[in-house]
Every structure is written in structure tokens, then in C-alpha cells.
A protein has these predicted regions:
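Hydrophobic recognition helices of helix-based DNA-binding modules
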Residues: 32-36, 155-157, 210
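Conserved tyrosine-mediated DNA breakage-rejoining catalytic core shared by Y-recombinases
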Residues: 102, 111-154, 235
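Short, charged phosphate-coordinating catalytic segments
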Residues: 34-52, 95-123, 218-224
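Active-site/catalytic core of tyrosine-dependent DNA strand-transfer enzymes
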Residues: 146-194, 200-201, 205-206, 213-214
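Catalytic-site neighborhood detector that most strongly recognizes the C-terminal catalytic loop/helix
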Residues: 74, 133, 226-264
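N-terminal core-binding DNA-recognition domain of tyrosine site-specific recombinases/integrases
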Residues: 1-34, 170-175, 195-201
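C-terminal catalytic core of tyrosine-transesterase DNA break-rejoin enzymes
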Residues: 20, 97, 101, 108, ...
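Basic, Lys/Arg- and aromatic-enriched nucleic-acid-binding interface segment
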Residues: 19, 23-28, 38, 58-106, ...
């Protein structure tokens, strides 16, 4: 089995699959072997004993197989100006503006419904991502997203803000990403080697702009704004119990409003 696992990893690498995908394959094989170890017994012998007494794949490393994950890069200021100077449909401009000013994930924004657009008692407009199915399996992505003053929404309507196709998992990121990249993001790349600039880059842009604020907001505040995994002093259960008390919407609003977006003018 260890030899077979390595051969499988080699074959998947030859097909151009990423290391993370190959790890998923091995994880599935691990699960199958562990199930067999725990549930399948040789009943032709006395006493009955398991066919497999240990997982022979446990120590097989596939860290050197497959393409390593490539991280996306934030757009340069020139590219941001170029992007928002392009002629585009109103809904496309709205979505790109939401991404660069809030740091939301593409799927979070592409799946927005008008009933998620709300105002708090202080008149702060926000997207309510605290309820319903999450696009990321992370409880901390459930949050309230404060909208800065530079983000203007059209007149409130009903249904979805955007109309991208849903995949089998009920997500829109694949269709939205393909469309926005081909129509806009690819056009602002410097050359063919500048291939890490995609629509997801706008989330990186907002993260970088937030971190460059003076004074710099705490990492916990930044995490609550963008919905990243939380790594502060509180445990997950403590954070869940105190959700909406950890960081007030007005704090998020004040922070995102400090970020300047001259490319939107």
C-alpha cells in the first residue's frame, strides 16, 4: 500500500494536480484503510482478527508531490486606477467596489440578497452575513460587514443583488470569477507573467490598505472586518458566545472609512 500511494501521487502529479488535491486523495485513502482496520475482520481464523491491524499509509509523505499553491497578489495602485477606469456594467462596478472596500470573499458578495442589506440604530449600512449558509466552513466568516461611505448602493430592491450561475454547491464564485477576470482583471495585468492578479486580489488589496493605516487597527479587529480565522486570546466558544460584542459595527465602520480609495473617484 505505501508503494501504491506513492505511485498514485506520482500519477496525479503527472496530470498537473496541485499538492493540496493530492493530499485530499491520500486523505480519502487513509479514511478507507482506517475504516477497514476498524470494521473488517478475518472470520476464517480463530480467534477472529482484523484484516488490517495498522494504517500502512500513516507515515507516507506526499508533501513533495504536485504543484504548490500559488498565492494571488494585490493589484498595484496603477492597476486599481486602470481597473476602475474601464467601461463596465453598473452591477459589475458595484461588485468590484464591494470587494475592494469591504474585503469580502467573492462568493459572499456574489450571493448577496437585498434582505441582507440593513441599517443599525446609528444609521450605519451593513451586509448581514451572520445568518444562513456560509460560503466558507468557518464560523468567524459569519459577521456584519460595515459599508464605508465611498460605497454607494443602488435603490433597494428584492431578491439577489447579482445574477451569477450557481454551481452544485449553491455557490457563485466560479462563474463570477471567470466572468470578472476575463472581462476586466486580465485587461489590467502588465504582461503575460503578471498572472497572479485576479478578482480575489481585491480582498488582498483591502487587507493591505487596512494594515497600512496609522494607527494600525488590532489584528483581531482586522480579522472581524474581513472574516479571517480568529487567532486572538479568546477560544472559539468564547468568541461565539460574545459575537457582536467582540467588535461593534461602529468600530468596523470607523476603520473601513479611514481607508482612501482614490481609484473610485
Amino acid at each position: 500500500l505505501p508503494v501504491h500511494a506513492v505511485k498514485i501521487a506520482q500519477e496525479l502529479e503527472n496530470r498537473g494536480l496541485a499538492n493540496a488535491t493530492i493530499k485530499n486523495y491520500k486523505s480519502a485513502l487513509d479514511g478507507l484503510v482506517v475504516f477497514a482496520k476498524n470494521n473488517l475482520n478475518n472470520e476464517t481464523v480463530t480467534p477472529v482478527r482484523p484484516w488490517i491491524v495498522a494504517n500502512p499509509l500513516a507515515d507516507v509523505s506526499i508533501s513533495n508531490y504536485g504543484a504548490k499553491k500559488r498565492s494571488w497578489e494585490a493589484l498595484t495602485e496603477d492597476q486599481l486606477h486602470h481597473l476602475f477606469s474601464l467601461l463596465m456594467l453598473g452591477k459589475d462596478r458595484l461588485l468590484l467596489t464591494i470587494l475592494v472596500t469591504t474585503g469580502m470573499r467573492l462568493d459572499e458578495a456574489a450571493l448577496l440578497q437585498w434582505d441582507q442589506v440593513k441599517k443599525d440604530k446609528n444609521g450605519i449600512t451593513y451586509f448581514d452575513l451572520s445568518m444562513g449558509a456560509l460560503v466558507k466552513n468557518d464560523k468567524f466568516s459569519a459577521r456584519l460587514v460595515a459599508l464605508p461611505d465611498c460605497l454607494s448602493l443602488p435603490k433597494k430592491a428584492t431578491g439577489k443583488l447579482f445574477n451569477f450561475k450557481l454551481d452544485d454547491d449553491g455557490k457563485s464564485a466560479k462563474d463570477a470569477s471567470r466572468y470578472l477576470n476575463e472581462k476586466y482583471l486580465h485587461r489590467v495585468r502588465f504582461d503575460k507573467n503578471d498572472d497572479r492578479k485576479v478578482v480575489h486580489s481585491l480582498r488582498h488589496n483591502l487587507s493591505g490598505l487596512l494594515q497600512n493605516l496609522v494607527p494600525t487597527p488590532s489584528s483581531e479587529h482586522l480579522d472581524w472586518i474581513t472574516g479571517h480565522d480568529m487567532e486572538g486570546a479568546k477560544t472559539a466558544s468564547e468568541r461565539k458566545r460574545t459575537y457582536n460584542q467582540d467588535i461593534d459595527l461602529s468600530i468596523k465602520y470607523e476603520i473601513v472609512n479611514r481607508v482612501k480609495h482614490p481609484w473610485l473617484k
